[in-house]
């Protein structure tokens, strides 16, 4: 296993641990999710480049599209919760139900 894979796996694991440990604030959860997506993107891109899989070269772009959609939805939810309640606690998401 090369050093690049080890670093990206370490970045993914640190982001996952951050998501599991610091889930009280929504902003920290969103940052951890973005870190996970970034490490997955780099691992996928390096794997495709190393194996010369030309048919799978669009997969990292598709992952980035989904990551951008996730970030937009997460930030809009963060803005809605913070303007409604004045704080970004994840526990306020249960209060948004009708």
UniProtKB/Swiss-Prot annotation:
Ranges that cross the membrane: 1-21, 29-49, 61-81
Assigned EC number: 7.1.1.2
Keywords: Electron transport, Membrane, Mitochondrion, Mitochondrion inner membrane, NAD, Respiratory chain, Translocase, Transmembrane, Transmembrane helix, Transport, Ubiquinone
Coiled coil: none
Protein topology in the membrane: Multi-pass membrane protein
Catalyzed reactions: a ubiquinone + NADH + 5 H(+)(in) = a ubiquinol + NAD(+) + 4 H(+)(out)
Locations listed in the record: Mitochondrion inner membrane
Keyword presence, Mitochondrion: yes
GO biological process: ATP synthesis coupled electron transport
Main location: mitochondrion
InterPro entries tied to this protein: NADH_UbQ_OxRdtase_chain4L/K, NUOK/Mnh_C1-like
Disulfide pairings: none
GO cellular component: mitochondrial inner membrane; respiratory chain complex I
A single MF term (Gene Ontology): NADH dehydrogenase (ubiquinone) activity
Described function: Core subunit of the mitochondrial membrane respiratory chain NADH dehydrogenase (Complex I) which catalyzes electron transfer from NADH through the respiratory chain, using ubiquinone as an electron acceptor. Part of the enzyme membrane arm which is embedded in the lipid bilayer and involved in proton translocation.
Description of how the protein assembles with itself and partners: Core subunit of respiratory chain NADH dehydrogenase (Complex I) which is composed of 45 different subunits.
Family: Belongs to the complex I subunit 4L family.
Protein name stated in the entry: NADH-ubiquinone oxidoreductase chain 4L
Species per Swiss-Prot/TrEMBL record: Sturnira lilium
Gene that encodes the chain: MT-ND4L
């Amino acid at each position: 296993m090369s050093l690049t894979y080890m670093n990206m796996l370490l970045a993914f694991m640190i982001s996952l641990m951050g998501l599991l440990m610091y889930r009280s604030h929504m902003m920290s959860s969103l940052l951890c999710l973005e870190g996970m997506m970034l490490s997955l993107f780099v691992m996928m891109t390096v794997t495709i480049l190393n194996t010369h899989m030309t048919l799978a070269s669009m997969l990292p772009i598709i992952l980035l599209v989904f990551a951008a959609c996730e970030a937009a939805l997460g930030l809009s939810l963060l803005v809605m919760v913070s303007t409604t309640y004045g704080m970004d606690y994840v526990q306020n998401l249960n209060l948004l139900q009708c």
